Amino acid sequence: TVKHILSKTNDCELTGVQHGDSQPNAVDLRVKKIFEINKKSPFIISEEGKTHRGSTEVQPDEEGWFNLERGTYEIIMENVVSVGEGYAGFVITRSTLNRNGLFITSGLYDSGYHGVMAGCLHVRVGPAKIKKGTRVGQFLLFEAETLSMYDGSYGIGKQHDNKYGEISGS
């Protein structure tokens, strides 16, 4: 069952929600930062650990526009989410981006996750210009049987998320 995260009937919270962000079944997410993923460094993963490729922050121009060429980027939203027990969530792309050759992929937000909303922005047909603060994704929350709470390497206070700097709502 899909639930609305802004409903008072769940133990979940989403910060940074602005007027107009609440949609009938989801909440719009606004872009805060974009990092270009390093294409030359290998990504290494095993059951023993992982080594990320690394990335470089894309600076918006003086008017707040991110100028993006075709490629894959790590995208950071203005929002921080806390997913309560019995729930999970994921991010989908807003349809306007999808119809223009851009899409966002994101992992599952497990019960117990508290942290930054992030994912990969794939610019399949470039170039693209996205203004900082623009609504680019939507967060969907749903009921999920919880066998244990999230204890991974992402989230507020975790090493990976330190590169994002000060995050409001933490």
Predicted segments with their positions:
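DUTPase catalytic domain/fold
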Residues: 1-170
